[in-house]
Amino acid sequence: MITVYFIGTGGGAPNKRGLPAIMVRREGFDALFDCGEGTQWRMMEHNLSFMKIKLIGITHMHGDHVLGLPGMIETMGMYSRKESLLLMGPKELKEFLEDIFKKTYFYPNFEIQIIDKYEDENIKISTFETCHTIESQGYLFEEKDRLKIDIDKLRKEGIKDWRIIRMLKEGKRVEINGKVLLPEDYLIVKKGIRIAYTGDTGPCEKVINAVKDVDLLIHDSTFIDEKEAYKYGHSNSYDAAYVALKANVKRLALFHISPRYDDTYEMLIKAKRIFEKTFVAEPLSYYIIRQKE
């Protein structure tokens, strides 16, 4: 199971929706994507601990996506964080943080590692290029596929010995009464959950190709008017829905809503005409995705 917390879902200037910040949680692994101004305060409102964050990914260096990061790291230090923090982001991120820490006389008392991608036995996190006015990258959070034993099939064949089941799960051949059991005949692939977050982007083929078949696409939907969206390297809800449709995603969350819109009804209706399984990412809400069979 993966839970996506929409901490801040607005864009541009500070507003009631909050500035961009999304946390993805899987079995104790918390990853934060973007860290707009006020993120740590909104996390406290959400009863989420920023001390437990293991990885932070920044999409680009516009202030509404990154200005909350130095303060959060400084607070982690004040609270005596010991665990290393993994950072992903544009090439300017390292210099940006070093400069602020130097000028504010802050010296991190925990390790900060800047990495290009992340992978462990359960998940992998990678980036893809988006179409914004400056260098910008989206993020893919992917749960790895798992192998599951088809217990029902084994029971139908009268096999209940847990030692045999374990050997098959380990990929070993088993012989019983002259019959050879092959692991591939009893293993089911349990598909991992895949989530994509675009950050700021206009609609483009490179994003469509990067997010194909994901379970949840969190896509820029800043404006209603397309001319204004394209002028500033953003998308409208129609664009986001078109990307979702072309990429064959399962669900679409409209994100990075301009503070000029108090009511998102028109935005949502326009998107749902193209891609029905669309919702507006509301601030301080969460979305749960369970692993597929």
From Swiss-Prot:
SUPFAM superfamilies linked to this entry: Metallo-hydrolase/oxidoreductase
Free-text cofactor note: Binds 2 Zn(2+) ions.
Top-rank EC class of the record's enzyme: hydrolase
Entries under HAMAP family matching the protein: RNase_Z_BN
Complex formation: Homodimer.
Job of this protein: Zinc phosphodiesterase, which displays some tRNA 3'-processing endonuclease activity. Probably involved in tRNA maturation, by removing a 3'-trailer from precursor tRNA.
Protein name: Ribonuclease Z
Record organism: Sulfurisphaera tokodaii (strain DSM 16993 / JCM 10545 / NBRC 100140 / 7) (Sulfolobus tokodaii)
